[in-house]
Amino acid sequence: MSGTDAGITRRTLVKSAAVLATAAPAPLLARSPKLPRVGRYAGLVEDGVLAFKGIRYGRAARFVRAVAEPWDGHALAADKFGPICPQRAMGEEPQSEDCLFLNVWTPEANPRAGRAVMVYFHGGAYTTGSVTDPLTHGAKLAADGDVVVVTVNHRLNALGYAWLKPFGARYADSGNLGQLDLILALQWVADHIAAFGGDPARIMVFGQSGGGAKIATLMAMPAAKGLFHSAATMSGQQVQASGPAHAWSRTLALMAALKLAPGDVDGLRTMPVERLMDGLDASDPIMSGGIYFGPVLDMTNLPRHPFWPDAAQQSLAIPMILGNVREETRAFLNPRGPKLQGLSWENIAARILPEIKIDLDPVWVVEQYRSHEPNWSPEQIYYAATTDGRSWPGQVIEADERAAAGASATWVYQFDRPSPVDPLRGAAHTDDIPYVFGTLAAPGSFSGVDQAARKLSAAMMRAFTGLAKTGRPGLPEWSAYRLPGRATMMFDDTVRVENDPRRWQRELWATAPYVQPGT
């Protein structure tokens, strides 16, 4: 056991004992099955497991680093989700800047149980999203996987990632506040999860899309070292972070959209949050689309790019799963929408061009795809090329950099199962989420609930929970990713391993450099 691990374990035992002590004279679990208790927290029973929702892990003023909040001695209800971070286009879900809450599902709140812990970070880039989505409720995963599941909300968009350091020391941690929130949540887990039946020495982080990108970034942040012991990213990569110059341009664009003078940071800090959210409609000064905020290379909290020029040394020993979905962009580029209407060989190159993130001649790209796959339709090539040139390269870079650095405990998957619910959707971005969580029947799932879906879900749950429990996926046939073989688990109705299954696409897109969108 390393000195770091030993320190975490000792601290956890002391703090977990303190959590339990606050429950006296009440028992660890209330006698009523409707009101389980762990220390200060009164939760509920959900689908056969104990659920504790809306647990505060920190509190923060706008644009400054969050801190843990001492307990004042009063009992705390933990029976509903806390509010999510303010954001655009999230309907009627309660939003608040006071959003630093997490949720726990556990089969048994016994401090001696020592179950592996799986901590989930949500997608939505760094801009939107929450863990209140029914697809990411943790009861099924906790029950069937025999693990403790934790899901975390944190600050997003300008509230979590606007770069304000040029305005002075008060804002020294800006640009990475959302990441520091996640680190604070992981510190809470390390300190308290034993009271919920979890093992603080077996904490796995996993996340989809933006959640995976947040994990990749944490793997290069010194303050995150030792707080998790395995990781899995699902269609979410972060090769480079934003540089401070681009980050500053985005801050100035936000302030201009809000009609603030360039130096009026007090106005930005004190304006109503609803008005601040309106500013997110501003155009991004660096790339097309709405204004983007994400992690910043500040040389303090994030002293290097996550996976450039190589994989961060501090995380090479962390066992890791990396995965992507075969046709990610079917979720972004609606097959029933205008970008696909009238698609033909005559216009496909022009329509591909704005969707790819690697600067290659789209006419040449289409020629290569037609040469390798002469039976593919324009639609098939459109989705393959936009996925391969937009959503997939980051995963290839991260896996290759880990392999090149000698990180042998790396496993890669490709999710191929098309939706049986919507045939035009194919296998699209987010479609692997319900298979891992076991939430096949949840609103928003495209998986269906047939026998094939249930069988694949069981396999993916074994893979992920196995990594959390043992540091290896729970599928013995899954070979580690090494060069030049590039073993890849193919998740479909048939689960199998293939070596470098998209070799020619990988080589095609490697002919030009990849620059992380938003950097």
Question: Where are the regions a protein language model picked out?
Answer:
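Alpha/beta-hydrolase active-site loop
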Residues: D173-I193
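Non-catalytic accessory segments of hydrolases
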Residues: L20, L28-N176, F446-M460, A468-E477, ...
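Substrate-access "cap/lid" subdomains that shape
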Residues: R88-M90, D191, K225, S230, ...
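Mobile gating loops/cap/lid regions near enzyme active sites that modulate substrate access
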Residues: W392-T519
